[in-house]
Amino acid sequence: MSEKKPHLNLVVIGHIDHGKSTLMGRLLYEIGAVDPRLIQQYEEEAKKMGRETWKYAWVLDKLKEEREKGITIDLGFYKFETKKYFFTLIDAPGHRDFVKNMITGASQADVALLVVSAKEGEFEAGISPAGQTREHVFLAKTMGVDQLVVAINKMDTVNYSKERYEEIKNQLIRLLRMVGYKVDEIPFIPTSAWEGVNVSKRTPEKTPWYDGPCLYEAFDFFKEPPRPIDKPLRIPIQDVYSIKGVGTVPVGRVETGVLKVGDKIIINPPKAVGEVKSIETHHTPLQEAIPGDNIGFNVKGVEKSQLRRGDVAGHTTNPPTVAEEFTGRIFVLYHPTAIAAGYTPVLHIHTATVPVTFEELLQKLDPRTGSVAEEKPQYIKQGDSAIVRFKPRKPVVVEKYSEFPPLGRFAIRDSGRTIAAGVVIDVKKAEGY
């Protein structure tokens, strides 16, 4: 793997059974990222079960299973490279904690592949109000995944019909435009994961009416997202250690800005001020750390007891914002009844977890257009998009999504389920900060 290529995290989204695993399994197999002997082995196992079409999907599913069983296997499967980029494939949805990981995890997606099935009835189910195609597209956009490639898959089930392709493409363009995607920048690729059409190479004999890129080529259409070096420093803390002979060492990932040895920093909410004595990443000393670096840094003048996971470090000249309250735009993914003002679930934002109250429902948005459907609604329910005023029940750092994307994305959870996901539009600073 070449180290010089920029690295992108790719998430694969779309309705269940539309062929996400099979398509990615096929791609990894065709470009040589998977040992062909494994595919052979899966083929034999799949045949025995009468499910031969599953052999490519098993590439990913077997790995998931083995990972869940705690067997360490080579995650090289989840990595592949194109001419321009080095990709890490993030667990596709269907994974229980997918939404939470998408927001709080290191698995922050940069770009997405949306897979939809061309099969009669399947496409319609995915794009229906209850379908995952719609939900995942909303979620991806809400979570700041601004670049997308679309695979219109299972084209073999409709005899590679140009009419069916156009019909689906036009419906998707409507959905994607409504959510806020720039549709003229999105490639729509007719694929068959099962027959290997337009996956790693163009297949004009099957789709003579299509003259665009194959899936593998389309991944190079992505633009590299800017790494926010010129923004003020923000480091959400993951852990804090006290090391004998060194002192207090917070650990976290630099999200924005640059941290240098000798810098004066403040860690909020506790208002702990200190000087950076040393920085290291994976046991290698650094003079400075930039966005994307996972680091431990020794701070003089701060005790371990003052800090905890969820605190955020910044420079004393631009301290992280502690929120009295904040306004967010959310999408309700799951709720058994309805949400009204006063509801107090749990807020997950960067590495922090605190109880939060829905203080006021300001507007309900039309999920089809994003325009205001209702001012000051009494309640919101599953499938709704809304603007809400939130009040954290404990001090927590919250930043505007427009200024600090990684600290302005959040999930709302209750009893182990993700209720909603959203972005911060505005923050009212807490007094005394």
Curated annotation (Swiss-Prot):
Residue span(s) of domain tr-type G: 5-227
Top EC class, one word: hydrolase
One cellular component (GO) term of this entry: cytoplasm
Record-level Gene Ontology MF annotations: GTP binding; GTPase activity; translation elongation factor activity
Segments of this protein annotated with the region G2: 70-74
InterPro entries recorded: EFTu-like_2, G_TR_CS, GTP-eEF1A_C, P-loop_NTPase, Small_GTP-bd, T_Tr_GTP-bd_dom, TRAFAC_GTPase_members, Transl_B-barrel_sf
Identification of the protein by name: Elongation factor 1-alpha
Organism: Thermofilum pendens (strain DSM 2475 / Hrk 5)
